[in-house]
Curated annotation (Swiss-Prot):
Cofactor(s) for this UniProt protein: Fe(2+)
Keyword annotations: Aromatic hydrocarbons catabolism, Dioxygenase, Iron, Oxidoreductase
UniProt gene name: ligA
InterPro entries listed in its UniProt record: LigA_sf, PCA_LigA, Xdiol_dOase_LigA
Name of the protein described by the UniProt record: Protocatechuate 4,5-dioxygenase alpha chain
Catalytic reactions on record: 3,4-dihydroxybenzoate + O2 = 4-carboxy-2-hydroxy-cis,cis-muconate 6-semialdehyde + H(+)
Gene Ontology biological process terms from the UniProt entry: catabolic process
GO MF terms held by the record: protocatechuate 4,5-dioxygenase activity
Subunit organization: Composed of two subunits (alpha and beta) in a 1:1 ratio.
Recorded superkingdom: Bacteria
Amino acid sequence: MTEKKERIDVHAYLAEFDDIPGTRVFTAQRARKGYNLNQFAMSLMKAENRERFKADESAYLDEWNLTPAAKAAVLARDYNAMIDEGGNVYFLSKLFSTDGKSFQFAAGSMTGMTQEEYAQMMIDGGRSPAGVRSIKGGY
C-alpha cells in the first residue's frame, strides 16, 4: 500500500517566498494581475509600436487598460514596481530595450546599483546571502 502524501496549501507555500527580501516569484496571481502590463510590453516587439510609444508614452499606455500604479511605474521606469504590478521581467525587457538599455542596466536599477556596480558584483560571485535570506528571521 502506498503512503498518502499530505496536501499542502499552495497559497501558504507561495506566501513563504514573500519572506525573502527582494524576491518576487512570478505566480499565476501575478500573471493575472499583470496581463495588460505584459501585453503592453510585448507590443514593443514591433518597430511601429515602439515609435508610437516613444512619441507619446502616456497616450500609448492609455490604450492598454493598465492600473494607475502600473502606468505610473512604466512612466517612472520603476522596474520593481512594475514587477509588483505583475510584470514579468522577460516581457519588461522589451521596455528597457526600447529605451536602449541593457538587461544588466535594468537588473542594477532593481538592486539599487549602477550598471557598473551590478556588473562588478556579478563578476565577484554575486550578492552575499548574509542579511537577505529572511525578513522575519532577520538573517
